[in-house]
């Protein structure tokens, strides 16, 4: 299961993002901002593009997570950002229903706290 965090902000300048050659979706700037917030505490890869937006991998307590980001422009240069936290699981774990993503997942809670404490983020929702 993927955990999703949605919020609105004008903190990021999407015009400075690299082009996503697969699909013109923004999201890179959120991942770069998160990388700065982490301060090398965790192995967080350089953002790369995908057809649904941008992603980085993070190694958290020996497990890999995909951190995905995308951005949708609403009205008046207000942007809705979507942050996805995806826990990678082995085939064995999937078959036997082990190591599922939960509300108490430490990696999810870490990113949740970062997002919740940023004063420029509004309309924060968790799915």
How should these model regions be labeled?
Residues 1-29:
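Short, extreme N-terminal segment that most often corresponds to the first beta-strand
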Residues 34:
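An amphipathic, basic-hydrophobic helix/alpha-beta surface used to engage anionic
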Residues 41-55, 117-127:
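Short glycine-rich, low-complexity/disordered patches
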Residues 52-103, 107:
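Amphipathic protein-protein interaction modules
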């Amino acid at each position: 299961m993927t955990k999703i965090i949605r919020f609105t902000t004008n903190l990021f300048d999407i015009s400075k993002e690299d082009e996503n050659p697969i699909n013109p979706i923004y999201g890179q700037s959120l991942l770069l901002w998160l990388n700065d917030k982490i301060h090398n505490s965790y192995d967080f890869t350089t953002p790369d593009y995908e057809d649904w937006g941008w992603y980085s991998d993070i190694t958290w307590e020996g497990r890999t997570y995909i951190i995905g980001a995308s951005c949708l422009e609403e009205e008046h240069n207000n942007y809705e950002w979507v942050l996805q936290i995806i826990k990678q699981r082995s085939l064995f774990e999937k078959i036997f229903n082990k190591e599922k993503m939960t509300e108490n997942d430490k990696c999810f809670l870490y990113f949740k706290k970062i997002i919740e404490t940023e004063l420029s983020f509004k309309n924060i929702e968790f799915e």
